[in-house]
Amino acid sequence: MSGNTLGTLFTVTTFGESHGPAIGCVIDGCPPGMSLAEADIQLELDRRKPGTSRHVTQRQEEDKVEILSGVFEGKTTGAPIALLIRNTDQRSKDYGNIADTFRPGHADYTYWQKFGIRDYRGGGRSSARLTAPTVAAGAVAKKWLREKFGTEIRGYMAALGEIDVPFIDWQFVRENPFFVPNADVVPQLEAYMDALRKDGDSIGARINVVASGVPVGLGEPLFDRLDADIAHAMMGINAVKGVEIGAGFASVAQRGSVHGDELTPEGFVGNHAGGVLGGISTGQDITVSIAIKPTSSIRTPRRSIDKNGQPAVVETFGRHDPCVGIRATPIAEAMLALVLIDHALRHRAQCGDVVVGTPKIAASAP
């Protein structure tokens, strides 16, 4: 299994399984001298951790992070930073009925066919539990980007199933368990999730992420374009089935006279490009939207096969998120931060001394 590392200069390698003793990651390439404590990382992990409301998995994990290396006297040393999160609430007996069968929509079948062995307990390596180390690494990236450039990365749930959530204000995002920017819609979402749980079913979601204060120039054409690497990273999140940058698929119906964001001495007029032109950041907000499929582990009986290829009926009894998207906002923020810090370091390495006479224009014209 060779696809466990993200990044070029700022790399993150995750390890562990859902029901193993621990999960974690090793960060390599973090610049030295940045103040870093476990509390800085814990703030982000607490936003993602399970068991925080009745609408998510009831697995009770504190997700307490331990910094094992790479930090001395409260500052990063430039050495690899090892982060450990111990699993404390595994309940592997819940998965005995799927040891020899495959859940429809899950990685069970493909992991078995590819590796010839699979850890069926909670999905093993394919579990969304493995997004916790990603969020931990993202906390480190967020801190560096914020201190270096003033970059702010924020996300919110834009849709839950067929319910679209109108954007009202960022302040509401941190005040509800759905990460929605609209307090008025929360009761509707709660009723929807309560009914879904009674049905033993699941649903998908749409998450929007915005990075403000990103410097112009990040991205490495042709094949390491910034938007390409963002899409690559976002598709690495469990259950993500679609990614949009800027106007995304709406660009199909837009004329060039509308989609092309005009430039004026006062700044850009519009941001249909999502802050990326030619694979390079423009200095505008980076806007990303991801589509998350319904959770595969549900109580509804479904047809499948067993390891011998014989018909089987699968019903999952473990503790699962009826909508993975409810806890996906900090995960998507972390992924965007990891891509941005990697490209910031790559830009500094090759083009840090480049100076042109053309002034950098504002992200948005007044």
Curated annotation (Swiss-Prot):
Highest taxon of source: Bacteria
Cofactor note: Reduced FMN (FMNH(2)).
Binding-site positions, NADP(+): 48, 54
Any GO BP annotation: aromatic amino acid family biosynthetic process
Recorded catalytic activity of this chain's protein: 5-O-(1-carboxyvinyl)-3-phosphoshikimate = chorismate + phosphate
EC id: 4.2.3.5
Family: Belongs to the chorismate synthase family.
Protein name listed in UniProt: Chorismate synthase
Species this protein is from: Paraburkholderia phymatum (strain DSM 17167 / CIP 108236 / LMG 21445 / STM815) (Burkholderia phymatum)
Encoding gene per record: aroC
